[in-house]
Amino acid sequence: MNRFVIICLLFTYYVIWSLLPIFEIENSNPVVSLLFPISSNVAIFLPIFLLLIGFTLTGSVLGVLLIRSDKKKKV
């Protein structure tokens, strides 16, 4: 249950962080700049970057496994 609460809090923080530019309150309030010190553009590009890294690593591992299994069949 504790893990679920932490995940919900992180998701809520991320959603608020990514919606700040829509309501134009990113730099207007000092409390907001303390809670969200990094620009909201990072909130958009971070998942894209992580997905690219994940797909690259997954593809690399699958490629190595396919090459190794093909070499074993030939021997």
Swiss-Prot record:
Pfam families: DPM2 (PF07297). One of its GO terms (cellular component) is endoplasmic reticulum. The chain crosses the membrane at residues 5-25, 42-62. GO terms for biological process: dolichol phosphate mannose biosynthetic process. The keyword Transmembrane helix applies. The keyword Membrane applies. Keywords: Membrane, Transmembrane, Transmembrane helix. It is found in: Membrane. It is a multi-pass membrane protein. InterPro entries: DPM2. GO terms for molecular function: enzyme regulator activity. This is Uncharacterized protein YIL102C-A.
